[in-house]
Protein backbone atom coordinates (compact mmCIF):
# COMPACT_ATOMS: atom_id res chain seq x y z
CA UNK A 1 0.00 0.00 0.00
CA UNK A 2 1.10 3.55 -0.74
CA UNK A 3 1.77 5.65 2.35
CA UNK A 4 -0.68 8.42 3.10
CA UNK A 5 0.54 11.93 2.22
CA UNK A 6 1.45 14.05 5.24
CA UNK A 7 -1.30 16.31 6.57
CA UNK A 8 -1.53 19.86 5.10
CA UNK A 9 0.56 22.22 7.23
CA UNK A 10 -0.37 25.52 5.47
CA UNK A 11 1.42 27.48 2.74
CA UNK A 12 1.42 26.83 -1.01
CA UNK A 13 0.22 23.43 -2.14
CA UNK A 14 2.72 21.52 -4.28
CA UNK A 15 1.66 21.47 -7.93
CA UNK A 16 0.76 18.16 -9.51
CA UNK A 17 3.23 17.12 -12.24
CA UNK A 18 0.64 17.52 -15.04
CA UNK A 19 -0.18 21.05 -13.79
CA UNK A 20 3.50 21.95 -13.81
CA UNK A 21 3.81 20.77 -17.41
CA UNK A 22 0.67 22.73 -18.39
CA UNK A 23 1.97 25.92 -16.80
CA UNK A 24 5.33 25.48 -18.54
CA UNK A 25 3.61 25.08 -21.91
CA UNK A 26 1.44 28.16 -21.28
CA UNK A 27 4.51 30.19 -20.29
CA UNK A 28 6.32 29.22 -23.49
CA UNK A 29 3.20 30.06 -25.52
CA UNK A 30 3.05 33.52 -23.93
CA UNK A 31 6.72 34.05 -24.77
CA UNK A 32 6.11 33.08 -28.41
CA UNK A 33 3.09 35.37 -28.44
CA UNK A 34 5.20 38.29 -27.21
CA UNK A 35 7.82 37.55 -29.85
CA UNK A 36 5.13 37.59 -32.52
CA UNK A 37 3.46 40.75 -31.32
CA UNK A 38 2.93 43.04 -34.30
CA UNK A 39 2.78 46.81 -33.95
CA UNK A 40 -0.56 48.46 -34.74
CA UNK A 41 -0.93 52.08 -35.93
CA UNK A 42 -3.95 54.36 -35.71
CA UNK A 43 -5.15 56.15 -38.84
CA UNK A 44 -4.05 59.54 -37.44
CA UNK A 45 -0.44 58.32 -37.24
CA UNK A 46 -0.57 56.95 -40.78
CA UNK A 47 -1.84 60.27 -42.14
CA UNK A 48 0.72 62.38 -40.28
CA UNK A 49 3.19 64.27 -42.45
CA UNK A 50 6.16 62.57 -40.78
CA UNK A 51 4.82 59.02 -40.95
CA UNK A 52 7.68 56.56 -40.39
CA UNK A 53 6.71 53.96 -43.02
CA UNK A 54 8.86 53.12 -46.03
CA UNK A 55 6.06 51.37 -47.92
CA UNK A 56 2.28 51.16 -47.57
CA UNK A 57 0.94 47.81 -48.76
CA UNK A 58 -2.72 47.21 -49.59
CA UNK A 59 -3.37 43.45 -49.59
CA UNK A 60 -6.98 43.70 -50.78
CA UNK A 61 -8.07 42.47 -54.20
CA UNK A 62 -7.25 44.53 -57.32
CA UNK A 63 -10.87 45.70 -57.74
CA UNK A 64 -11.02 46.93 -54.14
CA UNK A 65 -7.72 48.76 -54.64
CA UNK A 66 -8.91 50.32 -57.91
CA UNK A 67 -12.02 51.74 -56.23
CA UNK A 68 -9.96 53.54 -53.58
CA UNK A 69 -6.80 53.17 -51.52
CA UNK A 70 -4.51 55.09 -49.20
CA UNK A 71 -2.36 57.64 -51.07
CA UNK A 72 1.01 56.19 -52.01
CA UNK A 73 0.03 52.58 -51.33
CA UNK A 74 0.88 49.65 -53.59
CA UNK A 75 -1.39 46.68 -54.24
CA UNK A 76 -0.08 43.23 -53.30
CA UNK A 77 -3.27 41.16 -53.00
CA UNK A 78 -3.20 38.03 -50.88
CA UNK A 79 -6.33 36.99 -52.82
CA UNK A 80 -7.10 38.30 -56.30
CA UNK A 81 -10.69 38.98 -57.38
CA UNK A 82 -11.33 35.45 -58.70
CA UNK A 83 -9.76 33.79 -55.65
CA UNK A 84 -11.65 36.01 -53.24
CA UNK A 85 -14.94 35.18 -54.97
CA UNK A 86 -14.13 31.47 -54.91
CA UNK A 87 -13.32 31.43 -51.19
CA UNK A 88 -16.38 33.54 -50.41
CA UNK A 89 -18.65 31.14 -52.30
CA UNK A 90 -17.19 28.16 -50.45
CA UNK A 91 -17.69 29.94 -47.12
CA UNK A 92 -21.33 30.84 -47.77
CA UNK A 93 -22.56 27.85 -49.75
CA UNK A 94 -20.42 24.84 -48.78
CA UNK A 95 -18.50 24.92 -45.49
CA UNK A 96 -16.53 27.66 -43.68
CA UNK A 97 -13.84 25.12 -42.71
CA UNK A 98 -13.29 24.09 -46.32
CA UNK A 99 -13.23 27.77 -47.31
CA UNK A 100 -10.57 28.57 -44.71
CA UNK A 101 -8.37 25.69 -45.91
CA UNK A 102 -8.68 26.81 -49.51
CA UNK A 103 -8.03 30.41 -48.51
CA UNK A 104 -4.93 29.40 -46.55
CA UNK A 105 -3.47 27.62 -49.59
CA UNK A 106 -4.09 30.58 -51.89
CA UNK A 107 -2.94 33.22 -49.41
CA UNK A 108 0.26 31.32 -48.57
CA UNK A 109 1.10 30.97 -52.26
CA UNK A 110 0.47 34.66 -52.98
CA UNK A 111 2.39 35.89 -49.93
CA UNK A 112 5.39 33.81 -51.00
CA UNK A 113 5.38 35.54 -54.40
CA UNK A 114 5.08 38.98 -52.82
CA UNK A 115 7.88 38.36 -50.32
CA UNK A 116 10.18 37.53 -53.22
CA UNK A 117 9.73 41.07 -54.56
CA UNK A 118 11.07 42.49 -51.27
CA UNK A 119 13.95 40.07 -50.88
CA UNK A 120 16.54 42.85 -51.26
CA UNK A 121 15.01 45.06 -48.55
CA UNK A 122 17.18 45.68 -45.48
CA UNK A 123 16.13 44.66 -41.98
CA UNK A 124 15.27 48.33 -41.25
CA UNK A 125 12.61 48.50 -43.98
CA UNK A 126 9.29 49.48 -42.33
CA UNK A 127 6.14 48.45 -44.19
CA UNK A 128 2.59 49.34 -43.19
CA UNK A 129 0.01 46.73 -44.18
CA UNK A 130 -3.76 47.05 -44.39
CA UNK A 131 -6.79 45.22 -45.78
CA UNK A 132 -10.52 45.98 -45.65
CA UNK A 133 -10.86 46.19 -41.87
CA UNK A 134 -7.54 45.05 -40.41
CA UNK A 135 -8.47 41.38 -40.34
CA UNK A 136 -7.08 38.09 -41.56
CA UNK A 137 -5.74 39.20 -44.94
CA UNK A 138 -3.42 41.90 -43.59
CA UNK A 139 -2.54 39.90 -40.47
CA UNK A 140 -1.46 36.92 -42.60
CA UNK A 141 0.99 39.02 -44.60
CA UNK A 142 2.19 40.92 -41.52
CA UNK A 143 2.88 37.75 -39.54
CA UNK A 144 5.17 36.35 -42.24
CA UNK A 145 7.04 39.65 -42.61
CA UNK A 146 7.34 39.95 -38.83
CA UNK A 147 8.79 36.45 -38.54
CA UNK A 148 11.36 37.33 -41.22
CA UNK A 149 12.42 40.25 -39.03
CA UNK A 150 11.02 43.36 -40.69
CA UNK A 151 9.43 45.90 -38.27
CA UNK A 152 5.99 45.60 -39.84
CA UNK A 153 2.94 47.62 -38.73
CA UNK A 154 -0.78 46.96 -39.20
CA UNK A 155 -3.35 49.71 -39.72
CA UNK A 156 -6.01 49.38 -37.02
CA UNK A 157 -9.41 49.11 -38.67
CA UNK A 158 -7.91 48.83 -42.16
CA UNK A 159 -9.30 50.73 -45.12
CA UNK A 160 -12.64 51.21 -43.31
CA UNK A 161 -10.89 53.37 -40.69
CA UNK A 162 -9.34 55.46 -43.46
CA UNK A 163 -12.63 55.92 -45.29
CA UNK A 164 -14.30 57.00 -42.06
CA UNK A 165 -11.56 59.61 -41.57
CA UNK A 166 -12.18 60.92 -45.10
CA UNK A 167 -15.92 61.22 -44.51
CA UNK A 168 -15.47 62.93 -41.15
CA UNK A 169 -12.56 65.19 -42.02
CA UNK A 170 -13.13 66.38 -45.59
CA UNK A 171 -15.91 68.88 -44.90
CA UNK A 172 -13.96 70.46 -42.04
CA UNK A 173 -10.90 70.82 -44.25
CA UNK A 174 -13.03 72.57 -46.88
CA UNK A 175 -14.52 74.92 -44.28
CA UNK A 176 -11.03 75.77 -43.00
CA UNK A 177 -9.74 76.68 -46.48
CA UNK A 178 -10.04 80.11 -48.11
CA UNK A 179 -10.70 79.72 -51.84
CA UNK A 180 -10.26 82.26 -54.62
CA UNK A 181 -12.26 81.12 -57.65
CA UNK A 182 -11.19 81.70 -61.28
CA UNK A 183 -14.38 82.15 -63.34
CA UNK A 184 -15.07 82.71 -67.02
CA UNK A 185 -16.50 81.08 -70.16
CA UNK A 186 -15.08 77.96 -71.79
CA UNK A 187 -11.97 78.60 -73.84
CA UNK A 188 -10.58 81.62 -72.00
CA UNK A 189 -7.67 79.66 -70.49
CA UNK A 190 -8.75 79.26 -66.86
CA UNK A 191 -6.81 76.01 -66.48
CA UNK A 192 -3.68 77.55 -68.00
CA UNK A 193 -4.02 80.53 -65.67
CA UNK A 194 -4.29 78.17 -62.71
CA UNK A 195 -1.07 76.44 -63.79
CA UNK A 196 0.70 79.80 -64.10
CA UNK A 197 -0.47 80.79 -60.61
CA UNK A 198 1.01 77.53 -59.29
CA UNK A 199 4.32 78.26 -61.07
CA UNK A 200 4.40 81.60 -59.26
CA UNK A 201 4.39 79.74 -55.95
CA UNK A 202 0.75 80.17 -54.98
CA UNK A 203 -1.47 77.37 -53.69
CA UNK A 204 -3.70 75.79 -56.34
CA UNK A 205 -6.34 73.05 -56.30
CA UNK A 206 -6.95 71.59 -59.77
CA UNK A 207 -10.25 69.72 -59.50
CA UNK A 208 -10.24 68.71 -63.16
CA UNK A 209 -6.85 67.03 -62.75
CA UNK A 210 -8.11 65.15 -59.67
CA UNK A 211 -11.24 64.05 -61.58
CA UNK A 212 -9.42 63.27 -64.88
CA UNK A 213 -12.03 65.30 -66.76
CA UNK A 214 -12.27 68.80 -68.24
CA UNK A 215 -15.72 69.48 -66.91
CA UNK A 216 -18.12 69.49 -69.89
CA UNK A 217 -19.92 66.93 -72.05
CA UNK A 218 -16.80 66.97 -74.25
CA UNK A 219 -14.40 66.98 -71.32
CA UNK A 220 -13.41 63.30 -71.05
CA UNK A 221 -9.64 62.90 -71.12
CA UNK A 222 -8.37 60.72 -73.99
CA UNK A 223 -7.27 57.24 -72.86
CA UNK A 224 -7.98 58.08 -69.21
CA UNK A 225 -10.77 56.78 -67.02
CA UNK A 226 -12.24 58.88 -64.26
CA UNK A 227 -11.57 57.70 -60.72
CA UNK A 228 -14.35 56.33 -58.56
CA UNK A 229 -16.19 58.81 -56.35
CA UNK A 230 -14.32 57.43 -53.33
CA UNK A 231 -10.92 57.75 -55.00
CA UNK A 232 -11.69 61.33 -56.05
CA UNK A 233 -12.56 62.19 -52.44
CA UNK A 234 -9.32 60.54 -51.30
CA UNK A 235 -7.34 62.67 -53.78
CA UNK A 236 -9.20 65.80 -52.66
CA UNK A 237 -8.59 65.02 -48.99
CA UNK A 238 -4.90 64.39 -49.63
CA UNK A 239 -4.55 67.66 -51.57
CA UNK A 240 -6.29 69.73 -48.88
CA UNK A 241 -4.31 68.00 -46.13
CA UNK A 242 -1.14 69.51 -47.58
CA UNK A 243 -2.56 73.04 -47.86
CA UNK A 244 -1.31 75.91 -45.69
CA UNK A 245 -4.64 77.11 -44.29
CA UNK A 246 -3.20 80.53 -43.47
CA UNK A 247 -2.99 81.27 -47.21
CA UNK A 248 -5.67 81.24 -49.94
CA UNK A 249 -6.08 78.45 -52.49
CA UNK A 250 -6.82 79.30 -56.12
CA UNK A 251 -9.38 77.06 -57.80
CA UNK A 252 -11.32 76.99 -61.07
CA UNK A 253 -15.09 77.39 -60.99
CA UNK A 254 -16.95 74.14 -61.64
CA UNK A 255 -20.51 72.87 -61.75
CA UNK A 256 -21.66 70.39 -59.12
CA UNK A 257 -20.41 67.54 -61.34
CA UNK A 258 -17.17 67.01 -63.22
CA UNK A 259 -18.02 64.23 -65.65
CA UNK A 260 -19.38 61.45 -63.43
CA UNK A 261 -17.83 62.87 -60.26
CA UNK A 262 -19.99 64.78 -57.78
CA UNK A 263 -18.31 67.59 -55.88
CA UNK A 264 -18.89 67.39 -52.12
CA UNK A 265 -21.80 69.68 -51.29
CA UNK A 266 -19.68 71.74 -48.91
CA UNK A 267 -17.03 72.31 -51.59
CA UNK A 268 -19.61 73.39 -54.18
CA UNK A 269 -21.13 75.82 -51.68
CA UNK A 270 -17.67 77.16 -50.83
CA UNK A 271 -17.04 77.87 -54.53
CA UNK A 272 -20.29 79.82 -54.68
CA UNK A 273 -19.45 81.85 -51.57
CA UNK A 274 -15.76 82.49 -52.33
CA UNK A 275 -14.09 85.58 -53.76
CA UNK A 276 -13.87 85.37 -57.55
CA UNK A 277 -11.59 86.59 -60.33
CA UNK A 278 -13.37 86.77 -63.70
CA UNK A 279 -11.40 86.22 -66.92
CA UNK A 280 -12.58 86.53 -70.53
CA UNK A 281 -11.38 87.06 -74.09
CA UNK A 282 -12.84 87.48 -77.57
CA UNK A 283 -15.20 84.77 -78.80
CA UNK A 284 -13.02 83.95 -81.83
CA UNK A 285 -9.95 83.47 -79.64
CA UNK A 286 -11.89 81.26 -77.26
CA UNK A 287 -13.04 79.13 -80.20
CA UNK A 288 -9.50 78.76 -81.54
CA UNK A 289 -8.18 77.89 -78.08
CA UNK A 290 -10.88 75.22 -77.67
CA UNK A 291 -10.08 73.64 -81.05
CA UNK A 292 -6.41 73.37 -80.05
CA UNK A 293 -7.09 72.14 -76.52
CA UNK A 294 -9.66 69.54 -77.60
CA UNK A 295 -7.72 68.29 -80.64
CA UNK A 296 -8.47 64.67 -79.73
CA UNK A 297 -12.14 65.36 -80.55
CA UNK A 298 -11.32 66.63 -84.04
CA UNK A 299 -9.32 63.46 -84.66
CA UNK A 300 -12.23 61.18 -83.68
CA UNK A 301 -15.24 62.90 -85.22
CA UNK A 302 -17.58 59.90 -84.82
CA UNK A 303 -17.10 59.98 -81.07
CA UNK A 304 -17.58 63.76 -81.04
CA UNK A 305 -20.87 63.43 -82.93
CA UNK A 306 -22.08 60.84 -80.42
CA UNK A 307 -21.26 63.19 -77.53
CA UNK A 308 -22.99 66.14 -79.21
CA UNK A 309 -26.17 64.11 -79.69
CA UNK A 310 -26.34 63.59 -75.94
CA UNK A 311 -27.21 67.31 -75.68
CA UNK A 312 -30.43 67.02 -77.72
CA UNK A 313 -32.72 67.21 -74.69
CA UNK A 314 -31.10 70.47 -73.64
CA UNK A 315 -30.69 72.23 -77.00
CA UNK A 316 -33.31 70.75 -79.32
CA UNK A 317 -33.23 68.87 -82.61
CA UNK A 318 -32.48 71.85 -84.89
CA UNK A 319 -29.42 72.98 -82.93
CA UNK A 320 -28.05 69.44 -82.74
CA UNK A 321 -28.42 69.02 -86.50
CA UNK A 322 -26.44 72.23 -87.07
CA UNK A 323 -23.62 71.01 -84.83
CA UNK A 324 -23.60 67.60 -86.54
CA UNK A 325 -23.21 69.36 -89.89
CA UNK A 326 -20.22 71.30 -88.56
CA UNK A 327 -18.67 67.97 -87.53
CA UNK A 328 -19.39 66.35 -90.90
CA UNK A 329 -17.73 69.27 -92.71
CA UNK A 330 -14.91 69.40 -90.12
CA UNK A 331 -15.75 73.02 -89.41
CA UNK A 332 -14.27 72.84 -85.94
CA UNK A 333 -13.88 76.56 -85.31
CA UNK A 334 -17.53 77.17 -86.25
CA UNK A 335 -18.57 74.33 -83.95
CA UNK A 336 -16.52 75.76 -81.08
CA UNK A 337 -17.97 79.25 -81.56
CA UNK A 338 -21.52 77.88 -81.62
CA UNK A 339 -20.99 75.77 -78.53
Language-model segment annotations:
Residues 26-71, 99, 167-175, 179-183:
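Flexible, polar/low-complexity N-terminal or interdomain linker segments that lie immediately upstream
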Residues 102-156:
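Catalytic cysteine-centered active loop of the rhodanese-like fold, especially the PTP/DSP P-loop
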Residues 269-276, 280-339:
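Conserved NTP phosphate-binding and transfer environment spanning the P-loop NTPase/kinase superfamily
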Residues 180-199:
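Glycine-rich phosphate-binding P-loop
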Residues 50-122:
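Positively charged, proline/Ser/Thr-rich regional signature most characteristic
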Residues 205-269:
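Conserved nucleotide-sensing/catalytic segment adjacent to the nucleotide-binding pocket
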Residues 1-2, 13-14:
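Short, positively charged low-complexity motifs
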Residues 128, 150-164, 206-211:
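A short glycine-rich beta-strand->turn/loop micro-motif centered on a GG-aromatic cluster
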Amino acid sequence: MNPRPPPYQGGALPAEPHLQRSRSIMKRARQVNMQRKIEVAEIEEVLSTDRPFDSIIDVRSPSEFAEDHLPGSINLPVLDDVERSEVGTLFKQIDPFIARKKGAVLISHNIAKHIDTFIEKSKDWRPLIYCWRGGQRSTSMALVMHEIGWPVTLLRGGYKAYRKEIQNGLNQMILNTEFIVITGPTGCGKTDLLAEIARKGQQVLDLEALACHRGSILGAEPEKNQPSQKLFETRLYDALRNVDQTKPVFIESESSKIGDIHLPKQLFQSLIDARAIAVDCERAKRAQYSVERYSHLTEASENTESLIKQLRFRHGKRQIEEWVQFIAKKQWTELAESL
